Amino acid sequence: MDVILLDKIGKLGNLGDQVAVKAGYGRNYLVPYGLAVPATKENVAAFEAQRAELEAQAAERKAEAEARAAQLSEIELSLVAKAGDEGKLFGSIGPRDLADALTQAGLDVVKSEVRMPEGPIRKTGEYDITLQLHAEVTSSVRIVVVAE
């Protein structure tokens, strides 16, 4: 199935690229979420007519993400959690907990933007957490976990 991408998608392509994807991926994910349209003659012509407008919107979203990244990179957040004698937490701190804590600190962060490749935090200490704000924009936030 050939589709025209309406946004930059990692490991697939950029805005306006015409790519071949498996039918299920296109039909069940890309098209319903507004990330692509089927590459018919009508859609190709309509996309070329709207290309400048879509590129301007994409550039605006990227600029907003870069502004958020600059704001977030200056933040050091302290979280208090119950922990044992050796610093091991009772429970863990995951992406949802971090997103909620950043939102309470006045920053607009959703759970899906938090990247924790090592898994949830299970010990007290300092951690650098990566936030994927846009396909091309990432930011790092320092999190300090202290025992209650």
Swiss-Prot record:
Record Pfam families:
Ribosomal_L9_C, Ribosomal_L9_N
A GO term for molecular function:
structural constituent of ribosome
Question: What gene makes this protein?
Answer: rplI
The entry assigns this protein to a family as follows: Belongs to the bacterial ribosomal protein bL9 family.
Protein name (record): Large ribosomal subunit protein bL9
Q: Has keyword Glycosyltransferase?
A: no
What GO terms fall under cellular component here?
ribonucleoprotein complex; ribosome
Family annotation (HAMAP family): Ribosomal_bL9 (MF_00503)
What this protein is reported to do is described as: Binds to the 23S rRNA.
**Which InterPro entries did the record assign?**
Ribosomal_bL9, Ribosomal_bL9/RNase_H1_N, Ribosomal_bL9_bac/chp, Ribosomal_bL9_C, Ribosomal_bL9_C_sf, Ribosomal_bL9_N, Ribosomal_bL9_N_sf
- One biological-process term from Gene Ontology? translation
Q: Is this entry keyworded RNA-binding?
A: yes
Q: Sorted alphabetically, which keywords does the UniProt record give? A: Ribonucleoprotein, Ribosomal protein, RNA-binding, rRNA-binding
